[in-house]
């Protein structure tokens, strides 16, 4: 069974060399792109929205972040009203384990480095997870 993304991020944060073990992990790539690429910042208000945390143990919640990464684009769709995006986001948070919900909020706010200080833009650019930031002319 695949590791939960929070477990992988904890592992990488403990030993940054472990990031090379996950170069083919698309869910991790999505997380890093949305957490660090300004063009992919989710069109949602910053901060933690009001939501009811799921009390189920990790792996027993209705959703898991690995499966939900494919749907991140929804939070940037221009055809959805802001209130609908917020409703969808809150619904996701309520379906995730509290650790994954906390991670999802950090991704949305592009503050992953606050949860995992050793996972930096420089590390991700150096390992090819995200594109290098280019300076505008």
Give the predicted meaning of each segment.
Residues 1-137:
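N-terminal nucleic-acid-engaging modules of covalent nucleotidyltransferase systems
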């Amino acid at each position: 069974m695949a590791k939960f993304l929070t477990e992988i991020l904890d592992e990488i944060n403990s030993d940054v060399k472990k990031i090379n073990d996950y170069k083919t992990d698309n869910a991790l790539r999505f997380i890093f792109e949305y957490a660090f690429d300004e063009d992919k910042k989710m069109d949602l208000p910053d901060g933690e929205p009001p939501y009811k945390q799921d009390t189920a143990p990790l792996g027993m919640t209705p959703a898991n972040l690995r499966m939900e990464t494919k749907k991140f684009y929804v939070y940037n769709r221009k055809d959805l009203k802001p209130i609908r995006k917020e409703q969808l986001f809150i619904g996701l948070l309520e379906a995730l384990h509290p650790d994954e919900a906390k991670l999802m909020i950090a991704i949305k706010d592009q503050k992953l480095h606050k949860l995992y200080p050793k996972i930096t833009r420089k590390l991700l650019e150096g390992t090819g997870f995200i594109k290098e930031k280019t300076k505008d002319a």
